[in-house]
């Protein structure tokens, strides 16, 4: 498991000029952007950040994913293939994620949160920031316009493998031009919405507690459950602990495949101990039992991690260790749109963390 900066560095090492990797690095930029938005909003990413950019003709929203979708028997060859792949492997290509989300929200009338929660149960790389905010982007509740696709778009990017054998070819839900789809799905025009301005959160990477640290405990969290955690890099000889929070299990309902993937990631961390409990109390108790006098944790935008860290910090000195920087975000003052963020950081994001040989 690699950090965003490490993936960027690997991509830049494979090209002669940084500009040749710009499109891929921009995709990584979305992940950095989503994390910054989650850090600013916390659990509010589970509610609409803006009113929908367009009003649906089908005004009511389903609060669940329909059974025919979950059972991959919609009759849409592409949709049924995407659902089958998601359930069987815990992974979908980014295009497939967007197509499936768009069809569910705009054609079937499923509330984006129901779809986002369903994805999060299954995706091995499930990340609430990227997942839920991407669904909001598709729905138009965190975007200038909703995301639509048509059969021509899908056929182009899949070489027709879904469309040619589909029994609904020529009469499917996404048949027609974008203008025709727009007219079928949305009310003409759009609601007036004030410009969205979203200030970044203050840097969380700051120490808490008092006194010197001689024997820290490294607390691994869901987004740092790997040997590459910066907290482990800062304290390579320290005891390390991962706590499975029953509240997380109840909230996200991860599938067995997702849990196995998590354990496989942790298996790469020598000496890690895995326990079940409330991190706010389990981490200090475990630290005391092992003779540790402080806690180190990797930076995380997750509100549950931050709340637990605040509680731990009242009992032990706690240090937040930053990840390798993907970009210089010091000039970012508005996260309301990705384009504003990317305009501020794109040049720095195209520079490697460690210059390549001869660079």
Model regions: which residues?
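Trp/Phe/Arg-rich N-terminal binding region typifying the photolyase-homology
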Residues: 1-26, 30, 40-53, 84-88, ...
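Active-site-proximal binding-pocket segments
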Residues: 2-10, 17-201
